[in-house]
Structure formats: structure tokens, C-alpha cells
A protein has these predicted regions:
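PP2C/PPM-type serine/threonine phosphatase catalytic domain
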Residues: 1-237
């Protein structure tokens, strides 16, 4: 079961988030990207990131070693090359967070401040770590997590796909017994909705699409200052 919902929010004119998934007999991949850049460049970057990763995985699925990592490197190169050739796309970039399943392998990938959470029963755990200026302040002990949530510069990220010719990519290996569901989202959701509220909504609504709708509705009710995207998948809730 897969639920997916992307909304422009209450303030922005353009939705620069993009989410998609493939459930193939060879592998499964679930992705959320949050683009940035002038004109429509953010929308181009997020769309290109997701589609490039999917294309690479489809064409190289027989590879076993570093398949997910290589697919994200490929996407980074695709975005960067276009940004160098097209003035309207110059400086564009995107976050990416995703979950890849192949056989007994479960991997989560992250660049930027989109998030992946694992859910088991009433427990929810953030798998990814934000690549953001505020997260660095939290890690240094300069501010608390609560202060970070309302910090005026919380949207400044320290890593993105496509802004440089190379990028540092986080890969997390997940124990298949650790989780029954995964929730991927852009910061438009995670900035407005606490993880404890996320798991409560996921468990309350038995339909994953309905749960996604309710999560987006809650983020919009709290201001909806950014685009909001959520992708929820796993077994029966």
C-alpha cells in the first residue's frame, strides 16, 4: 500500500516538490524531492532528480554494490550539467530522500532536509539527519531542537543535489524487522507537524492515502508556508 500527496501549500505559487515511486519485481524505490532555484528551476530540479534516479535503477538493476548511491550520483550529474548549460537553470538544486528495497536489502538515502521516518506500531523514528545550518547549530549545542523548529534560518540547507559536480550522500542500511511502514516528506510537513503527531495520524487512518491527506491538511492548517509532500508506504496500517 502506497499513499502519496503533494500540495502547493497556502503561500507559494508553484509546487517545487516532486514525489514518485516504482514497485517492480526487481526492486522498489520511493522518493521525495524539494527543489529550489529561480524561475521554474526548482520544479525542474526535483522532477529531474526523481526521474533520473528511477531511470538509473531500471537500467542497472542487475548491479548489487552501491546501486542506490550510484543512482543518486547520476542524478546529481544530470541536474548539474543542465544547470551549467541553461542560464534559467543556473544554481538550481534539490533535496532528495528515498527508500530502496531489493530482496532483503532496505536502504534510505538523503541529501538536504527532506526526511524519512520509520514506523512500527506507535513508535516513530527519524532515519535521516537534516543537512541544514540549523541542524549544525543543534549538533554544536548552540540551540535546542525546539529552538531549531522556529529558527528564522531553518530553511538554509548545507547540501543539495545538482549545485556542485559532486555531493556527499547519506545512505542508511535498515533492518527489515525495524519497521512496518516508512514516511517520506519534504520540510513543508516536518516543519509544521511533530513526528508524534505523524504516527498518531498514520495509525488513526487505515487508508494510507487518507492518512497523507490528513497530514497535509494539518500542515496547511498551521500556515502551509511551504510546499507540502508526503509519501507513506508499507504493510497494512
Amino acid at each position: 500500500m502506497v499513499g502519496i500527496k503533494s500540495d502547493v501549500g497556502n503561500v507559494r505559487e508553484l509546487n517545487e516538490d516532486y514525489a514518485a515511486f516504482i514497485e517492480d519485481e526487481r526492486f522498489k524505490i520511493y522518493l521525495v524531492a524539494d527543489g529550489m532555484g529561480g524561475h521554474n528551476a526548482g520544479e525542474i530540479a526535483s522532477n529531474l532528480a526523481v526521474k533520473s534516479i528511477m531511470r538509473y535503477l531500471m537500467e542497472h538493476s542487475e548491479e548489487n554494490e552501491d546501486l542506490l548511491l550510484n543512482s543518486v550520483k547520476y542524478a546529481n550529474n544530470e541536474i548539474y550539467e543542465i544547470s551549467q548549460k541553461n542560464d534559467k537553470c543556473k544554481g538550481m538544486g534539490t533535496t532528495i530522500t528515498g527508500c530502496f528495497i531489493k530482496g532483503d536489502i532496505i536502504q534510505v538515502v538523503n541529501v538536504g532536509d527532506s526526511c524519512c521516518f520509520s514506523i512500527k506500531g506507535n513508535e516513530i523514528k527519524k532515519v535521516t539527519k537534516d543537512h541544514s545550518w540549523v541542524q549544525e547549530l543543534i549538533d554544536a549545542g548552540a540551540i535546542t531542537e525546539e529552538e531549531g523548529r522556529v529558527h528564522p534560518k531553518k530553511n538554509i540547507i548545507t547540501r543539495a543535489l545538482g549545485t556542485n559536480s559532486s555531493v556527499k550522500i547519506d545512505i542508511f542500511n535498515i533492518d527489515k524487522n525495524e519497521s512496518t511502514m516508512f514516511l517520506l516528506c519534504s520540510d513543508g510537513l516536518s516543519n509544521e507537524v511533530q513526528k508524534e503527531e505523524m504516527v498518531e495520524i498514520v495509525n488513526r487512518y487505515k487508508n494510507v492515502n487518507e492518512a497523507c491527506e490528513k497530514l497535509v491538511d494539518l500542515a496547511k492548517a498551521r500556515g502551509g508556508k511551504d510546499n507540502i509532500t508526503v509519501l507513506l508506504f508499507g504493510g497494512e496500517v
